[in-house]
Amino acid sequence: MKKLVKSAVVFAGLVFIGTSATMITEKASAASTDPVQKVDGQATYIPKGVRDGTATEEHDGFEDGTNSVLQQVPLLRATTGYPDVNAYIKSNKFSTAKIEKQLKSQFPKFNYRNGYGKPEGIVIHETANNSSTITGEINYMSTNYNNAFVHAFVDKSRIIQIHPTENGVWGAGQYANARFIQVELVRSKTFDEFARSINNYAYYAAYLLDQYNLPVDSAHSDGKGTVWSHDAVTRYLGGTTHTDPVAYFNQWGYNFNNFVSLINEKYKAMQVNYEKIEYDKAITAYSRVKTATGNSVWTKPNKTEGAKLVNPLSSYSGKNLRIIREAKTSGGTIWYQFSVGGKTIGWVDSKALNTFYTPSMEKTITGTRYVLPSKQTVHYYGLPVEDSAIDRGPLSKFNGQALTLQREATIEGQLWYRVKDLGWVKAVNLTTTKYDLIEYDKAITAYSRVKTAAGNYVWSKPNKTEGAKQGSALSTYSGKNMRIIREAKTSSGTIWYQFSIDGKTIGWVDTKALNTFYTPSMEKNLTATRYVAPGQETQHYYGLPVADSAIDRGPLSKFAGQTLTVQREATIEGQLWYRVKDLGWTKASTLTATQYDKLEYDKAITAYSRVKTATGNSVWTKPYRTSGYKLVNPLSSYAGKNLRIIREAKTSSGIWYQFSVGGKTIGWVDSKALNTFYTPSMEKTITGTRYVLPSKQTVHYYGLPVEDSAIDRGPLSKFNGQALTLQREATIEGQLWYRVKDLGWVKAANLTTTKYDTLSYDKAITAYSRVKTATGNSVWTKPNKIEGAQKISALSTYSGKNMRILREAKTSSGTIWYQFSVGGKTIGWVETKALNTFYTPSMEKNLTATRYVLTSKKNEHYYGLPVVDSAIDRGPLSKFSGKTLTVQREATIEGQLWYRVKDLGWTKAANLSAKKQ
């Protein structure tokens, strides 16, 4: 399709007639107002790209290969030096290409202006692209079809149809698009290729005209006919400006009249005499489409006189075609006339169908059957095919009747029976068993329990009805509340109940096996006001007056304190139930006519309080004026005690505390009567490390910062010397407490930041020492690094003195300490390594001897221990002059022998004599 020409040609005989661009425009304009051009829904025939403004007819991407202006060309054959094309074709006896189909599903489908399958002719195009190929053109058009597309492409060796010719295309402007089949010719590079392509083109054009019973009539010169050049469309119809294929034909010494002449020759060769009908008879059969491609439906057998196209056979794919007549034509083809849904459609080649029913498939049988109750709505038919045209109605008319079988037929693997005086029905809809029928099946509401389990079962459907299967023994459900959801009566007169348990449908049971304890008929109207009884808030209400989890609507706590309107009552198994408006059913015992204080909340808390105002306050089992509250004691009974607050509740009269004492829960008291000295809000987060003060090992720690035996966790001694991690602190009544990780609460005064040594042991001993190393050593009030140890003096103060050792202690650091006295006065503690011990009792030995005080030594003294120490000086020996002294022990102290005399003490051996003086 060339661009808008500035001159064009009209062929008439051998005369050349030039037409200016102005004339073409005028004719096109005139054509556009011709009533014959007006088509309903004309926009359908305009390419989408043009409608959207993304393309124009002049610039649609197709046939835009040259901008050259066409020159005047001769009507018949230009003197180009090429042979006569038509003669060349005949002399070479070219064959024609096979018609290929590559239909593009993405192309839009729309009918011609006169309807589906009713083209009025054909438009001859050429591609205007010297370098393209037939596949390249098709591929490009397949992507850009919104700008333009045609029915087929032709080249030297192929004819490829890409769109059904029964539908229109977008190839030559809206007026041609509404009327014509359109075919593109791919350009050739040699004369021989051109001639071969023209041969294929003319054949295909003739084939299409013959297919649609259209004559060969050129519209090139007068705008009337069935064979149109694109150029003629421009000049006579409008809606386009292209002029192909005139210039391209002229390039090879060819013109449009030559082409129409070749079409006419091929068209005539296709014409044949009408076939005759050898027979035409009524038959009965059913078929479906087997091969839709290439087959159509005709008003009469095709190629017989008067045969016209009805529809492509594909229109009836998947449908049951009732074959009503069979005809054979002189060409040997057998044709079937068929109807669909009772309406006669037309004739089709029998080879295009698959026949699935003929009367020859039937066999004679005898037998009796009954309609399956579940198949009452299934229909029966005049023939063994589901076809609305022979539908005789539902099987329900014959419920319970004995049906006499006469014939059977297996149609597509499915067995059908013909019933006497009835018709055909699928065998699966009938049964040899006469089942009970359901006379009624209705929803009801009731509750029952098993009365007679023996011999009774649960069924999937009422027993003896179609499909009923035995389930478990009824005894499985003994003692359970069975909600009755449906009631059915069978034709045998038995009434059956369908029941559920806990919301799950179980099955059907004979009503005689049950005892029904609730039906709606037991209910009575009632008008009353009630309140949820305190203490009953956890009781539930239900959809019906039965405690069944499947209809449980939740606890009554949602309605505590609300005024409830009672509408109905029912006594179920001796127990009165109320139905509350907008609520449901609950036992009457859960409600009360008295309105108590309502608990707005009741929550666990942690606190400690003491009695602030005992006068006029009491302790109650529940918050005062709530349901079930009773007096426990006057509050004064707990004055001065630590009350642990464990719950807080709010009523319309105030806030109440529940408390315990010594771990025992006591009751509830008005919070205003107490002074709260601890709540968790008093706590603060801290970090730090502490150690147990050794002197506080017996002190206890607690679960909270309060000294309460109920939360006493034991003595701190378990944690001596351990680093304790602080987490929180609280000042309770002026006293600081610490919470220790993994431990609990302890008063801060029991801990220290210093890690003291602890005493491994501390025992009384007897010894005497003197200072060995004074330098760097001191005397302490306690062993150094023990809690409370204070320095007294330098050890050098006591150098040279006899230090009586009173006690020995060992600390956790491994050091051994001595507590000593000098002159009978206790001084302090000193590390043992700083001393030289010259006496210990271990130095003593037993001895038995008699001695006498030497006269010269009667003024010497004796001592409590073998050491000269004024603190243990017992006096002069003169008291015992002349007396016999019994020696019991001896000890050598610093090289000097001492004797211990019975009932006397120690004295140096030198003071005594073995002989009496």
Swiss-Prot record:
Residues 1-30 form the signal peptide. CDD domains: PGRP. Pfam families: Amidase_2, GW. Residues 279-358, 361-435, 440-519, 522-596, 601-679, 682-756, 761-840, 843-917 form the GW domain. Keywords: Cell membrane, Cell wall biogenesis/degradation, Hydrolase, Membrane, Repeat, Signal. GO terms for molecular function: N-acetylmuramoyl-L-alanine amidase activity. The keyword Hydrolase applies. Disruption phenotype: Decrease in lytic activity on L.monocytogenes and S.aureus. Decreased adhesion to mammalian host cells, however no change in host invasion and host intracellular growth. InterPro entries: Amidase/PGRP_sf (IPR036505), Amidase_domain (IPR002502), Glycosyl_Hydrolase_73 (IPR051056), GW_dom (IPR025987), GW_dom_sf (IPR038200). It is found in: Cell surface; Cell membrane. Residues 118-245 form the N-acetylmuramoyl-L-alanine amidase domain. Its EC number is 3.2.1.-. It comes from the Bacteria. One of its GO terms (biological process) is cell wall organization. Residues 262-917 are annotated as: GW repeat region, necessary and sufficient for cell surface attachment. Its main location: other. GO terms for cellular component: cell surface; plasma membrane. In the N-terminal section; belongs to the N-acetylmuramoyl-L-alanine amidase 2 family. A bacteriolysin able to lyse both L.monocytogenes and S.aureus. The C-terminus has 8 GW repeats. PANTHER family: EXO-GLUCOSAMINIDASE LYTG, PEPTIDOGLYCAN HYDROLASE FLGJ. This is Protein Ami. It comes from Listeria monocytogenes serotype 1/2a (strain EGD / Mackaness).
